[in-house]
Amino acid sequence: MTDELIHVHDQFYIVSTSARLDDRTRVLKHGDTFAVFDRSGDIEAPGPPELGIYHQDTRFLSRLMLRLANKRPLLLSSTVKEDNALLTVDLTNLDVPHNDEVVVPRGTLHIFRSKLLWDAACYDRLRVHNYGRANVDLLFEIEFDADFVDLFEVRGVTRAKRGRRFPIELNDGVLEFGYEGLDRQVRRTSIRLDPLPVGLFDNRIHYRLELPPGGYATYQFAIQCELDESRSRSTIVRPVLIYEDVAGVAAAALRAVTSAEPEIFTANEQFNDWINRSIADLHMMRTETEYGPYPYAGVPWFSTVFGRDGIISALECLWFDSNIARGVLSYLAATQAEKENAEQDAQPGKILHERRGGEMAHLGEVPFGRYYGSVDATPLFVMLAGAYHERTGDDQFIESIWPNIERALLWIDKFGDLDGDGFAEYSRRSPRGLVNQGWKDSQDAIFYEDGELAEPPIALSEVQGYVYAAKCAAATLAPTLGKKNFGDQLADEAEQLRRQFEEKFWCDRLGVYGLALDGRKNLCRVRTSNAGHCLFTGIASEERAGRIASALTEEPFFSGWGVRTVAAGEARYNPMSYHNGSIWPHDNALIAAGCARYGFKREAANILAGLFESSLFFDLHRLPELFCGFPRRPGESPTLYPVACSPQTWASCAVFPLLQACLGLAIRDHHHEVVFRSPYLPQFLPEVQINRLRVGRGSVDLTLTRHETDVAVDVVRRKGEVNVLVLK
């Protein structure tokens, strides 16, 4: 058979018949560990550069390949189960020749492979079944390697020097790889093998596969990621290879989480698939920290704490699971900056942007060990605190983080407003930090109408909305803590900001708020999705909200799949760019929530429809971090963005605010109320059922049914004190 790879002049070429042409990947994650495999469950080079098993921003396994008789098995099927806990793969053999004769025909052997991740270990089980009528005697080989490169190296950052690798060893059925980094930390990959191999050749283990007709054999290995700064090699804890026990523990942990959540069903099975995958992605990205659950941002590039991403994800799913918001607030309060540090872009009261734990971060080769370079995370933190309190009525928790809220508000006024003009701005202080520090943080994301890049300090339109909403939220919280005068002051400041924002940011020619003010207070007259966030936060005027909502949900903003980050026709518009014309699901979700806030339910439903219909084309019904903003073409799918994270938590969580926006759903814990304000359901959603929706100590089961001119809300079951209000 022709080799899949051709090597010419130090370049690899893939033949047109190779399975390598399919670059779709499979992702597993648990805690601080994640894995990216090809669809066969392997880690192969050359292949997508992100393939590997990673722990705390380091790749602990860079190669994992199965071979039968020196050939890769043929892929039959591959999927990640609906709950994201298990990757299953079906493989078979290719023809095995011997002396010009095929001794094992293609399709004789079935390999069922299942993989799961738990507690910094990957468990891999292979069951090989002989469906032939003759004995099989083959060489079965598994190749491993561990390069221990930092995640930033995988992303393309080069290093002048690296640490040292240890020799590969096989002891008592455990294959060991080791590396001592320049940070003096020893990182090890220990692979426990069952059964014991017949031999080790370089980094390849060999088995003799001998099966009678109808016979089968099982092979298991556990790949453990270990960080070891002080222990000797003899004291390292080996992974316990009991696959069924690990699977049982993982299933029990998932049941504990899901039992506390609502159930959502609709009359549209495809919509249910999208919801179920989104919920599973939220479960997978939810990571237990010492401060509670935190949704890591995305796999593979952002599987860590991000302030902005965590807050927005928590806001998106707040009605569904308020525990995540509490965990996010706790974590960010504990890591709030206490002093100025230019290298970290930190000032007192500022909320964390990003935290990293790899070798390069430890050494300061990248500034992201603990980095504060975002202008919006701090007001978003206060916004989330207010929203969490409204959802839960958790006075005690809000009181515990009130000092952090006060410090965040002080940062907004003292450090966030760089020139005293009343607007929050950014201008990086770290020479290695982010140039742009809003959610659109690409270097070319903030520009004038002629395409020239804007000069800092930059005051983003949506950030003023976040500050407005933060002060409104704190103004509501303050009286509950006996600080009514402070609350009144904050309310006055919010109203003053709203009037000033209207005067400086509105552009009548564009029909939306401008993108930003530059350092000389010139307006960047560019049509961007940022204006939709001004609807979301409520800073937009009632008189202009309708014009904005209409503009965002029509061309040149709306592609048919969603709202573009930059309208078609603008100077830097490019539907294939990261921030200048692509479509981001979380961005669309906040825009839809903003449209609904001002009563524009049909516009919100149009956004919901576009993203739902796009989900039908994406692998596993999973919305990626972003996709390209090309116009929708009949009979064609959305165009993928090649390096988008998938899953990305705030993209996966987009379904929650989209559905909430259409339903007009609000939960007011202090009043024991579930409120539906002018509920609206699009034609493809004739019925929505929500069970176990918790309000305080009570819960309620609800069914919403679409009629020609109305939506009926029926209470199916009520437990405890829960009032359901429908406002039309």
Question: Where does each model-flagged region fall?
Answer:
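A generic structural motif
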Residues: 129-134, 459, 474, 481, ...
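Terminal accessory carbohydrate-recognition/targeting modules of carbohydrate-active enzymes
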Residues: 1-279, 283-284, 288-293, 298-304, ...
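Structural motif corresponding to the C-terminal cap of alpha-helices
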Residues: 282, 286-290, 314, 336, ...
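Extended, well-ordered alpha-helical scaffold segments
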Residues: 234-249, 273-277, 321-335, 395-413, ...
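Aromatic-rich carbohydrate-recognition surfaces in CAZymes
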Residues: 303-435, 461-464, 468, 491, ...
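The core hydrophobic/aromatic register in alpha-helical repeat solenoids, strongest
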Residues: 166, 177, 385, 467, ...
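Generic structural signal for well-ordered, non-membrane alpha-helices
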Residues: 219-220, 280, 379, 383, ...
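Extended glycan-interaction surfaces of carbohydrate-active proteins
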Residues: 88-94, 103, 260-305, 330-372, ...
